[in-house]
């Protein structure tokens, strides 16, 4: 009888162990840690690349990742943060809508013990982010400004189209550009207006400015979407070739336009580099590392007709 009981118990134990092992394995798959990727807008190809590159790197590192679109709306961004903090995410890779306003959301995450890593756009509130991975916009626009001066022969009338007035990048780019261009008396800025980094708004701004100032020789735009919008307005006005267009970002359509001789130059940012760096640092933080840099600058490179063959897909071809 004792032997019969033993024969019955052993298979039961084995079956239990197998069941436990299977459920534990399935449980571990279901409970994969999550990282949130919050992007200011997905209505711009550059930011789509930034967001998707971050998601892809998180998945490569073994996390589930969710992409959130703030639609350039601070209220939408705040709503995303509320949902993220209530849902148990381990980290947030963040492209803010506003340098000042977005700090409140990042600070709330920090208080909740959820680390925030900023990509491309800066937050002014101290202690809100673990690390901010940012393009060196100021230096990049110094380089672009020098090429602008050279291309213009040190003289001419130009327009500046700014991005979002609440974004530090807008002013860093403008200051870098003017730190060079303002040294040349022959170069005169006849208008400066913002178009919120939006292609359609930039087209409308350029149409209006050309009517008020028919003698424009160039336009400097704070990003490539606006540069393409300005070019569309110039083309529609029959002034293609008469007004030089300069952008900033390194978006594919602008790089292709440089190849075709439609755009003079842009500043190549590297969204993939920033996204991969942010995801890698978040992974290190989750695993216990705390000795991480507060800021990481990413160099910007000038792209023009002389070197455009080396660039594509939001970066260098050899990357």
Can you name each region flagged by the protein language model?
Residues 99-139, 150, 157, 163, ...:
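Flexible loop/hinge segments that line or gate small-molecule binding clefts
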Residues 1-34, 107-114, 319:
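Short, low-complexity disordered leader/linker segments with a strong preference
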């Amino acid at each position: 009888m004792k032997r019969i009981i033993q024969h019955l118990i052993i298979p039961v134990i084995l079956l239990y162990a197998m069941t436990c092992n299977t459920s534990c394995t399935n449980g571990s798959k279901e409970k994969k840690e999550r990282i949130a990727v919050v992007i200011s807008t997905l209505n711009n190809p550059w930011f789509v690349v930034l967001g998707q590159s971050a998601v892809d790197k998180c998945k490569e590192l073994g996390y589930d990742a969710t992409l959130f679109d703030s639609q350039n709306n601070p209220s939408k961004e705040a709503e995303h943060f509320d949902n993220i903090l209530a849902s148990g995410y381990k980290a947030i890779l963040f492209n803010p809508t506003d340098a000042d306003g977005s700090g409140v959301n990042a600070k709330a995450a920090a208080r909740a013990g959820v680390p925030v890593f900023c990509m491309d756009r800066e937050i002014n509130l101290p202690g809100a982010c673990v690390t901010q991975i940012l393009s060196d916009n100021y230096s990049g626009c110094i380089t672009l400004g020098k090429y602008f001066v050279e291309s213009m022969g040190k003289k001419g009338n130009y327009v500046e189209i700014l991005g979002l007035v609440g974004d530090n990048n807008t002013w860093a780019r403008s200051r870098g550009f003017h730190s060079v261009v303002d040294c040349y008396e022959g170069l005169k800025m006849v208008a400066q207006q913002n178009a919120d980094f939006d292609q359609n708004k930039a087209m409308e701004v350029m149409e209006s400015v050309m009517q008020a100032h028919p003698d424009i020789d160039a336009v400097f735009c704070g990003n490539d979407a606006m540069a393409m919008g300005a070019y569309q307005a110039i083309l529609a006005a029959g002034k293609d070739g008469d007004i030089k267009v300069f952008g900033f970002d390194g978006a594919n359509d602008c790089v292709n336009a440089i190849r075709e001789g439609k755009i003079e130059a842009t500043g190549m940012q590297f969204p993939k580099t920033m996204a991969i760096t942010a995801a890698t640092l978040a992974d290190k933080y989750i695993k216990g590392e705390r000795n991480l840099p507060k800021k990481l600058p990413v160099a910007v490179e000038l792209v023009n007709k002389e070197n455009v063959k080396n660039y594509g897909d939001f970066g260098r071809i050899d990357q």
